[in-house]
């Protein structure tokens, strides 16, 4: 069994349901400390994080390439629906089954073994290697990567390159890498009316009727046209609530939850202003609370994307596509202190599902891609 596969199995066997790390990080830290990494645990409100760095011969003058990822996994769902216990790594039909196999314990194992092989082959490597690992990516993500980034920023630590081990591939290993993600912003809108008897609408004010024209305009709005890297910004309603459940009462208020997924072609302030303008134009009496869970980030083609492209082609023969689709990731936090952030990992078809798995034949090539990038950028 390869070193990467063995470590993947060890990590899967630890039931690290968010935010409980179950000592996965300690397992990684022990391996990294043996290589000469300086390892620092940064805990916050029950969340376990660590930052580890091994300086190259150039010290802080050299480039720093960091691997970032998460040890936490989502809950298993109904255990009886799994073909094998989710925290017992199981081989079947050329695949390794277990919660976290694809998202993202194989990537974590690949990071560690790639670093071990690289340091053994290049003991005098010029650049530096970092690890930024959290147990709060699948949860609220309020005490995880963002806390490590804040700590690093406070001490003036800057990363030059960062690979996030998210499962970005689709049909086969290496076909898709993510060089950015859209931002996410939600709004909680309450439109006020006047409650009354449904037979006497002239004595009441129906907030649903008042909201409907504005809602139609918001849904039809073209927020931007996107750009070379991002599709157009989208606005979607996630929840709409009003009424008491009775058939003869006009409700006193209507509550709407909505979400923007927005590109670098728009700004938080610009989108908020346009929403308020539409609501005001319809004369609504309302309150609106905003929540921004992530800003968009983008890494244009450059040293990191070129190195990753070359490594994937050499290892798999696949020509990767740069993409910014999907939800948010911890890359949005890391981009604050790193100009080049790219996500790359195994196929994602089974993530968060019953019987999550990874094709075993992708395990070592994934590690090899990570090692090749180290060799190209910091050897």
UniProtKB/Swiss-Prot annotation:
EC class of the enzyme, as a word: hydrolase
Catalytic activities: N-succinyl-(2S,6S)-2,6-diaminopimelate + H2O = (2S,6S)-2,6-diaminopimelate + succinate
PROSITE patterns reported in the protein's UniProt record: ARGE_DAPE_CPG2_1 (PS00758)
CC cofactor: Zn(2+); Co(2+)
Pathway the protein contributes to: Amino-acid biosynthesis; L-lysine biosynthesis via DAP pathway; LL-2,6-diaminopimelate from (S)-tetrahydrodipicolinate (succinylase route): step 3/3
One annotated GO biological process: diaminopimelate biosynthetic process
Binding site for Zn(2+) 2: 103, 138, 352
EC number assigned by the record: 3.5.1.18
Keyword set includes Hydrolase: yes
Pfam families hit by this protein: M20_dimer, Peptidase_M20
Domain of life according to the entry: Bacteria
Keywords, alphabetical: Amino-acid biosynthesis, Cobalt, Diaminopimelate biosynthesis, Hydrolase, Lysine biosynthesis, Metal-binding, Zinc
Metal-binding in keyword set: yes
Binding site for Zn(2+) 1: 70, 103, 166
Note describing how the cofactor binds: Binds 2 Zn(2+) or Co(2+) ions per subunit.
Alphabetical list of SUPFAM superfamilies matching this protein: Bacterial exopeptidase dimerisation domain, Zn-dependent exopeptidases
Gene Ontology molecular function terms on file: acetylornithine deacetylase activity; cobalt ion binding; succinyl-diaminopimelate desuccinylase activity; zinc ion binding
Active site: 72, 137
Family listed: Belongs to the peptidase M20A family. DapE subfamily.
Subunit structure: Homodimer.
Function noted in UniProt: Catalyzes the hydrolysis of N-succinyl-L,L-diaminopimelic acid (SDAP), forming succinate and LL-2,6-diaminopimelate (DAP), an intermediate involved in the bacterial biosynthesis of lysine and meso-diaminopimelic acid, an essential component of bacterial cell walls.
Protein's name according to its UniProt entry: Succinyl-diaminopimelate desuccinylase
Organism: Burkholderia pseudomallei (strain K96243)
